[in-house]
Amino acid sequence: MNKDKLSEIGLALERAVRNDCEKNITISFSGGIDSALVAFLASKYANVELITVGVKDSHDIEAAKSAAKIINLDLTVKELNDEELISEAAILQKKLKLTQFEVGFMLPFWVAAKNAKNKTLMCGQGADEVFGGYARFRESIDNTNLDEETRSLLEIIPNREKKISKLFGLKLSCPYLSEGVIQASKLYSKKQHIGIVGKEKLREAAIGLGLSEEIANRKKKAAQYGSGSQKVMKKKIKHEINFEMPFESDKVAESIKKATDPENDGWVESS
C-alpha cells in the first residue's frame, strides 16, 4: 500500500510537469531534490535549460554542477560578484516592494528569470510547504499545518514568482503546487512527510521515479543561503562593501531619498 501511495505522488508530479512542458523550457535550478526532480522529469518531455545563480564558490553552484552532471543535463551558471548582486537586489526590491529577507530569498529566481532563454520558467517552489521540508517543521511537528503553509504560499506566489515571470514575459510553472500533487500529498500524515530530515515521502517518491539517491537524499540550504545572497546582503547592511551610484551632492542624494521613501527602503543613502 505504501508503494501505491508513493506511486500516486510520483504520477501526480510527473503529470504536472508534463502538462506544463513546452518544446523548450527553463528551470531555476539549485541542485537540491526540489528542482532536480522537476528537471529530471521535464527532460523526458522537453529540451531543458538549467540556470543556477550564486556568488563564487557558493553552495548552490557547486550542488547544481554535480546534480546536473548526475542527471546528464547542461547547466548555465550565472555567477554574480557582490556589486552585481546588490544591484540586482535594488532593482528587485523596487519592482516588487519586498522585505530584505524576501529579496535575499528571491534573488536567484529573479536572475534566473532575467536570463531565461525560453518562455516557460519551471521551478521547485512549493515542495517544502506541501511535503514538509522546513527545519522549523521538524522542531515543532504538532504546531505545523502543511495545508495552511501551502495556502499561504499560493496567496504569495502571484505577487512574487508570478509577477517576476510576467516582468520578463515568461510563463511560470510550479508543479509542486498543482492541485493533483497537493491532493496526492494528503495520502500521508504531516508526521510521515516531515520525518527525520524533511520531505521524507517526496524523497522516497523521487527514488521510485528514478532520481539518483545521491540527489534525493541531499539536504538543501535555503535559497538565500545556498546562493550566497544573504551573506552579501548582510555585508551591505554592515557596510563591509562599497557599492555606489554617486549623486552630484549629499543634498541631491538626501532629496532623492526622501522623495522615494518608503520605496527605497534603505537602498538610497547619503553620507
Q: What are these regions, as identified by a protein language model?
A:
Residues 56-113, 134-144, 185-194:
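ATP-dependent adenylate-handling ligase core
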Residues 5, 9, 38, 60, ...:
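Hydrophobic (often cysteine-bearing) scaffold residues that line and stabilize catalytic clefts
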Residues 121, 126-143, 152-238:
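Mid-to-C-terminal catalytic subdomains of enzymes
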Residues 24-71, 76:
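ATP-dependent adenylation/pyrophosphate-handling site
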Residues 9-15, 19-24, 33, 62, ...:
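Catalytic cores of RNA-modifying enzymes
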Residues 13-17, 33, 38-42, 67, ...:
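Structural preference for long, well-ordered alpha-helical segments in enzyme cores
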